[in-house]
Amino acid sequence: MPARQFPFRPHLDQFRNQAKDLLRDVRAEAQSALDDFREFHPERIDPSIAALADAQLVLARSYGASSWPQLAAAVTAIDAISHDDFEALRKVAAAHPDLARDRDRPRDGWHAPLASAADAAIRRLMLQLRERGVHSADALLARPELQPVLDTLRLLGRLGGSPAGDWVGGSVEVLRGSDFALLAEIGADVRASLGWAALVLETYARDPAGKHRILEVMASHGVPLPDSPPMALHRGRLDLLEEHLRRDPALLARTFAHEDIYPASLACHDEHTLALHGAPLAGATLLHMAVDYEDLDVARWLLDHGADVNARAEIDAAGLGGHTALFNCVVTYNAGRKDEPLARLLLERGADPNARASIRKGFAFSRDPSPHEYRDVTPLGWGRRFHDQGMVSHGALRLIAERGGHE
């Protein structure tokens, strides 16, 4: 751990003067200077013959740098970042690759002010991009003239900078996989907050491709995703589902507890209503999950591999449950979608439009979050009676009615 506190706005002249003072003190055999030399110099030096280079090395190491050139490079980099002189920054970083921060070590010594300066520069550049009409990673990558900005963001990330946590969380909340991947590339500490892993599972948004990419980025950064069928489904990993099915031929008929779908190991909430979905998923099958998450490819794979399109969720002691996956098409956080590929797929594969179930459902964060009970309803009846019509997909109701569905 560094013995000296590195200033957040350093100037190289400060350190030059400190090195001269240290040399003077060690030659005078001042105890504090002798202690510094004993702790930070790799060799035993006779104080009477100590040179300025020795004092500079000791001073640099007391600030957490490996050498005087590294300390000087860190000061130069901090100054360049503070003045948005990114050409100078590129030069010093190229000459001193040891400035790159190991994310597994804490921000201390000279790493702290360098990372702090890089944080601020990332925020400035991101705001400038927004002012230029660039609001997503895809938009940035589509503009070749902005490649230097992207390269600078990546460099700032290597130097220890991180994008603001609210930007990272925002990309997770709406499942913008490309944005999350870019933010991770430029320094977001994906492992720092398991809350982001919980959010990607529990969010109201529906974008399977974005969700899959976020989870794969998390996995590549060491987030410990459980090896379970629900997690394989969350990730859209058909290869993992195939392996789970090989090990458990009855898998597609199995039902899963809430904790299997939203694991506590990823900081998912104890309060079940904070996992945002349509028809209840606790006690439901993988097909119910795939339909609720609007993952057409996974739903089709499950049906192709023998999943029962009319499989029912568990029924609890109060007689609630028993719904089929078709119910998950009806009440949804994505009620305004323009197409209904999941409802169409289920009906084409033989889903009963008049299956009956009893469901207790409330929507957290809605106008009326309290749970309501709907006894012995069909998918059509549930949708028409549901207390918050803003959560009902009328496109799904229309398709169900066309297939003979009634209340």
Where is each model-derived feature located?
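Ankyrin-repeat boundary/"N-cap" motif
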Residues: 76-79, 102-140, 162-176, 192-205, ...
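Short, hydrophobic/amphipathic alpha-helical patches that form generic packing surfaces
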Residues: 54-65, 116, 231-234, 289-292
